[in-house]
Amino acid sequence: MFYALWAKIFGASTDSLRILTLIISLITWQLVYYLFGLFTQKKYHALLLSTLVITNPYFFGTSVFVFTDMLTIMLSLAAIISFMKNKTILFIIFAALAILCRQYAVIIPISVSLYSLLNYKNDKQISRNNFIGSLLTFLPLLLLFGIWNNISPASGIEKWIIPNSSFYNVDYINTYITFSVIYIFPLVIVFFKKIKLIYKNILIAMGFTFLLSFFPFNLLISILEFTDYKTVGFVHQVFVELLGYESLWLKIVLAFFLWVGCYIKIELLKRFYQHIKTKSFDTKLIFTLMWILFLLIMPISYQVWEKYLTMILPFFILSIYLLLYPNHKIIQEVRN
């Protein structure tokens, strides 16, 4: 709708729409740096983390080509920043628009609503406002469901949804855990330098890696039929070309990154549990909640693609950073 409005005013040419995309991208880059600046201990940390996001090939690509991904990221960042600043009305607007751009943005209001329930006893008024606001963000999407008489337009269902196909694709979890750590590998190196490896967590991560290996990367029939894609994205394609499709070396490399991702998730979940146990609910928990919900909700999607990580990576990066560099003073000041 936003692009359609721009096209009516300034024309629907590719150049015109690309200018809009570049404007959105510049705003998004600023929002990424601003969000990191709220939580990082030093300014150059925010700059380095922002660079990690911006240099992602998909982030850069969607900044140039005409897709709605960058608009979704911009609105998602604006929604979370509004939540951090207790700007409930702005949060409702930005979150609702993000959901209209990409339905998987529902992780934003769901995360906020869950956080509000956890934090209700500590701050009843703000938690109540955030919870109600989160529910309101779904109204525009529900309206579209009513117009479509389904969860998507008939044309989309006919093209992308295959009868008798799996409703929940566990292999998506494998995909997103594996490639999430590859795209932020410099931070992963810092992570393993700063933490102390725990033998029990190593074994648990190996167990999850073993279980998820039974659900290898797999493109849906609809993707194979309607596109030329044979891999789940850029990095997967590079690995396939270097190591060979379905080769033993490819499986070993991907299994290693899956284990790395599982280990990081275990550390995040452990810290998350400690906060719940001690009833210490600060706003940084929202980033871990978003990552968990992303992994749980995306398997419902009709396709899997590395590009979809672009929206969640800024929040995933922050969840890891705040695990390594707890900074409670700044986090408390964010809402003031």
Language model features: what each stretch is:
Residues 19-40, 78:
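Transmembrane-helix motifs of polytopic, lipid-linked glycan transferases
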Residues 180-182, 233-266, 304-325:
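Hydrophobic/aromatic-rich transmembrane helices and adjacent perimembrane loops
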Residues 111, 115, 125-238:
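Membrane-lumen/periplasm interface segments of specific transmembrane helices
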Residues 38-39, 84-93, 116-129, 191-198, ...:
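Membrane-interface junctions at the ends of membrane-embedded or membrane-associated helices
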Residues 58-69, 305-306:
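Short acidic/glycine- and proline-prone juxtamembrane loop motifs at membrane-interface regions
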Residues 1-12, 22-23:
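Short hydrophobic/aromatic helix or loop-helix immediately within or flanking a transmembrane segment
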Residues 31, 52-55, 62, 71-94, ...:
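Specific aromatic-rich, kink-prone transmembrane helix
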Residues 49-50, 77-82, 88-103, 108-114, ...:
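Membrane-interface alpha helices of multi-pass inner-membrane proteins
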